[in-house]
């Protein structure tokens, strides 16, 4: 009904204009303009007849009619005026304008505007076609939604008509306006969105549907430089170093005894940080260093294979470390069975190895050098085992007075006659025709066992006991009672935490391990505390009070209850191979304390 009233009002207004203008041409144009609207009015009114739900349909029909009328008077869809020459021509001919003429006149009147639309359209296409890798993914999704929404909006508001070329042309013009213009706005919106740089390759390879956070963190994330600096400082303090060593790893050979000792430490569960060494008092020693002989001109004074001077530079041992043991290791070459058989006598098949500390050098023509016998060993010719000699007194003297380090003198002789050994069995020096690489595995080595004093007096099994009298008083070798433990992921337990030395660029001087699992403790300590939480009596009482009055005391904390040491094999600035057992480096067990 409202639509009819609105139409009558428009007709009345038009009649007034016709009387004033006195022209038939304008009337005909108006009728042609509102013809599509009139075609829709019966449908709208029909849907609005009746009561109940039909009333809502009437309101919607009126809204559609109003929209259609507004589009009929839209300056983009109907000519606003005509020229005087055109009106006089139509008055003289007294002809009804055809649809082709109306279409031609519409194009002439709106030619400037159409040109502007074409320019805007071209600019829009340039912006859309311009490659924008950062925003390509989100633009595609927004453009599809925007185009679908605008197409639906255009179809719902487009007036129904049988066939008219004028309406078809203006429909395409309106579509070009309401489709191209939002594309410009869309491009400006998406241009302000920052997409991570490493997302470009992911979007290009896998497409927009796989662009996710998991894809971005597929590669290993590296800490930022400032974090790496702090990590490096902390590790250097832990290793008791001022700076990481700068060495050429390719020129250094790791001695086989050091490798075997490292494997022995890592392959056995130790009760403390002490490094065991059969035959030596290495109690509380946590650091082992290996030294090689330093060549000098003095070597030429000992041309024979049975007597040689060895010099080791031990200045790299820190002054705050206490020497626990020192040994000289000599390798032996296997002799042929014919040589061993030719020396059938028991005394002739055994050699004696002696090592002296050179306490004073000699002066030619004035005094003889002074020697102090340190150790002696008897070896058999049919064996190739390493010979170990105790030289701790000499190393102690060198550490106290580095300028009086004159080296060690080693002699190999027969047991019975005490004559020089006739065969090149115990290796003291390099042969003239021997390759350098082979000699590096055969050369004499000095091993020092020191204690840096940084570890606590108690062992690892004492740490597991925690506070005396608690439930955690068991040592880690004592078997535990079987307990039925529920799988609660949020309760106190041990979690993995892998430390990779390559993250700080230390894999060039750390021989082994390249990384280790330090673990950490995390989780809740619920009330009541079960036996598997390895809690102390104090933790039980604290948890009980917290359950009664949470604001008075906090809950017990999930902390490490057992810690173990980690052995590391690395090189220092002097290219010395160091084997060190670091205390409390990895978590063995967790509990509520």
UniProtKB/Swiss-Prot annotation:
- Got any disulfides in this one, which pairs? 492-558, 521-590, 525-592
**Ranges of compositional bias, category Basic and acidic residues:** 98-111
A Gene Ontology MF term for this entry? Answer: growth factor activity
* Source superkingdom: Eukaryota
**Endpoints of the signal sequence:** 1-15
Q: Where is the composition biased (Low complexity)?
A: 56-70, 161-174
Q: Does the keyword Secreted apply?
A: yes
What segment(s) does the record annotate as region Disordered?
Answer: 45-174, 459-489
What InterPro entries does the database record attribute to this sequence? Answer: Cystine-knot_cytokine, TGF-b_C, TGF-b_propeptide, TGF-beta-rel, TGFb_CS
Entry-linked Pfam families = TGF_beta (PF00019), TGFb_propeptide (PF00688)
* Keyword field: Developmental protein, Differentiation, Disulfide bond, Glycoprotein, Growth factor, Secreted, Signal
Note whether Signal occurs among the keywords.
yes
**Residue ranges under compositional bias (Polar residues)?**
125-134
Q: Which SUPFAM superfamilies match?
A: Cystine-knot cytokines
Tissue distribution of the protein: Expressed in the imaginal discs associated with establishment of the proximal-distal axis of the appendages, and midgut mesoderm.
Q: Which CDD domains match?
A: TGF_beta_DPP (cd19392)
Cellular compartments annotated: Secreted
The entry sums up its family as follows: Belongs to the TGF-beta family.
| Assembly with partners or alone | Heterodimers of scw/dpp are the active subunit, dpp/dpp homodimers elicit a basal response and scw/scw homodimers alone are ineffective in specifying a dorsal pattern.
Q: Which PANTHER family match?
A: PROTEIN DECAPENTAPLEGIC, TGF-BETA FAMILY
Which protein, by its recorded name, is this?
Answer: Protein decapentaplegic
Identify the gene encoding this protein: dpp
């Amino acid at each position: 009904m409202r639509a009819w009233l609105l139409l009558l009002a428009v007709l009345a207004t038009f009649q007034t204009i016709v009387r004033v203008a006195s022209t038939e041409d304008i009337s005909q144009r108006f009728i042609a303009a509102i013809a599509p609207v009139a075609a829709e009015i019966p449908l709208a009114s029909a849907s609005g007849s009746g009561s109940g739900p039909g009333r809502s349909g009437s309101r919607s029909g009126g809204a559609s009619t109003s929209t259609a009328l507004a589009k009929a008077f839209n300056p983009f869809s109907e000519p606003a005026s005509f020229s005087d020459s055109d009106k006089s021509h139509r008055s003289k001919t007294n002809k009804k304008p055809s649809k082709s003429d109306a279409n031609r006149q519409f194009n002439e009147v709106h030619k400037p505007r159409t040109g502007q639309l074409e320019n805007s359209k071209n600019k829009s296409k340039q912006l859309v076609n311009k490659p924008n890798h950062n925003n390509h993914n989100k633009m595609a999704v927004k453009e599809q939604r925007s185009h679908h929404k605008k197409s639906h909006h255009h179809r719902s508001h487009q007036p129904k008509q049988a066939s008219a070329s004028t309406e078809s042309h203006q429909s395409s013009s309106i579509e070009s306006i309401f489709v191209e213009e939002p594309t410009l706005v869309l491009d400006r919106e998406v241009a302000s969105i920052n997409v991570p740089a490493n997302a470009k390759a992911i979007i290009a390879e896998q497409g927009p549907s796989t662009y996710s956070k998991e894809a971005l963190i597929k590669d290993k994330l590296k800490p930022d430089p400032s974090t790496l600096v702090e990590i490096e400082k902390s590790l250097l303090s832990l290793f008791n170093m001022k700076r990481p060593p700068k060495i050429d790893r390719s020129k250094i050979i790791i001695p086989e005894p050091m490798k075997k000792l490292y494997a022995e430490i890592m392959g056995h569960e130790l009760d403390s940080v002490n490094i065991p060494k059969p035959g030596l008092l290495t109690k509380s020693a946590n650091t082992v260093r290996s030294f090689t002989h330093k060549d000098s001109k003095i070597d030429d004074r000992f041309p024979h294979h049975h007597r040689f001077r060895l010099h080791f530079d031990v200045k790299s041992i820190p002054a705050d470390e206490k020497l626990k043991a020192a040994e000289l290791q000599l390798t032996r070459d296997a002799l042929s069975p014919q040589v061993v058989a030719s020396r059938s006598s028991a005394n002739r098949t055994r050699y004696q190895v002696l090592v002296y500390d050179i306490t004073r050098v000699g002066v030619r023509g004035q005094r003889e050098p002074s020697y102090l016998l340190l150790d002696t060993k008897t070896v058999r010719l049919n064996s190739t085992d390493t010979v170990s000699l105790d030289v701790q007194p000499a190393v102690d003297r060198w550490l106290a007075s580095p300028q009086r380090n004159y080296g060690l003198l080693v002699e190999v002789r027969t047991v019975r006659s005490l004559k020089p050994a006739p065969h090149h069995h115990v290796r003291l020096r390099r042969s003239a025709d021997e390759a350098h690489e082979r000699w590096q595995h055969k050369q004499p080595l000095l091993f020092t066992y020191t204690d840096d004093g940084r570890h606590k007096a108690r062992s690892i099994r004492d740490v597991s006991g925690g506070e005396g009298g608690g439930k955690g008083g068991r040592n880690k070798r004592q078997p535990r009672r079987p307990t039925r433990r529920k799988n609660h992921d949020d309760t106190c337990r041990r979690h993995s935490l892998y430390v990779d030395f390559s993250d700080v660029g230390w894999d060039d001087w750390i021989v082994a391990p390249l990384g280790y699992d330090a673990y950490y403790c995390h989780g809740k300590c619920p009330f009541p505390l079960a036996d598997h939480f390895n809690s102390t009596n104090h933790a039980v009482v604290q948890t009980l009070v917290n359950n009664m009055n949470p604001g008075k005391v906090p809950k017990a904390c999930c902390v490490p209850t057992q810690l173990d040491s980690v052995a590391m094999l690395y090189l220092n600035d002097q290219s010395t191979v160091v084997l060190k057992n670091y205390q409390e480096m990895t978590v063995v067990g967790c509990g509520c304390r």
